[in-house]
Amino acid sequence: ENFNYDIDIQDNRDYQTVFKFEPVDEDAYADIMWPKTHPAVGTPIKLRDYQVEIINSFLENPQCIQEIATGAGKTIMTASLSERVENYGRSIVIVPNKSLVTQTEADYANMQLDVGVFYGDRKEFGHKHTICTWQSLNVLLKNTKNQTVDITIHEFLEDVVAVIVDEVHM
């Protein structure tokens, strides 16, 4: 409205699966202890109230965007969302740079999730969750079009039911 735009978006996709995600509470991951590499080593992973609220909001309305402050624990929330979709398929998490790939991978591993990465020289397939960069996806798309890849973008996205974008503004 501030810029005189009126946008109407309609979702015309025909879903074959009805998603019924189990909501989280603060103790959803309390059976998992933080590892030695985490400042809270040896204590249970517990979600904060606002994290529970945000995660459950995404689970109720999976096609949404939320602005979440720095330091709010976005990566643990992302891992929680990925864990909740596991019964339906794979998740892809897109981050803007390699350091966020490795940080996100570490947090997923802390949550005992089956995680692989796709960027640079590390191209790991066959995992329930994949962390990648925009650049890696763009290269994969370009190479798919040029038929110069071992795996196509279509094969890469097979069984993906959730795409989570971190730092979407970048």
Regions found by a protein language model. Give the residues of each.
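Short loop/turn elements that form and flank the Walker-type P-loop nucleotide-binding site
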Residues: 60-61, 87-88, 125-127, 157-160
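Conserved motor-coupling elements within RecA-like helicase/translocase cores
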Residues: 120-130
